[in-house]
Amino acid sequence: MSCYDLCRPCGPTPLANSCNEPCVRQCQDSRVIIEPSPVVVTLPGPILSSFPQNTAVGSTTSAAVGSILSAEGVPISSGGFSLSGLGGRYSGRRCLPC
């Protein structure tokens, strides 16, 4: 679409159909409603890990089968994990020797 009809006259009648002045025409605004499409987000499932504590550490006797294990001769009950019989040499912060 030409906007020459919207330009001011360029002075005397031109010899050619031209104009040296800029011509800008602004049309009405358009409204568009953009609805977001559904987005599928996959969240990773939980990772379950298990670290059993059924080992005898520093046993001076053969491995016991049953509810009592020993570490350096001091019984360790199978109901939990305890290092209290090791005399404080091993804290929960250091790895125990193999």
Curated annotation (Swiss-Prot):
Family membership noted in the UniProt record: Belongs to the avian keratin family.
Disulfide bond sites: none
InterPro entries, sorted: Keratin
Protein name: Feather beta keratin
Gene Ontology CC annotations of this record: intermediate filament
Assembly description: The avian keratins (F-ker, S-ker, C-ker and B-ker) are a complex mixture of very similar polypeptides.
Pfam families: Keratin
GO molecular function annotations of the record: structural constituent of cytoskeleton
Organism field: Mycteria americana (Wood stork)
Positions where N-acetylserine occurs in the chain: S2
Record keywords, A-Z: Acetylation, Keratin
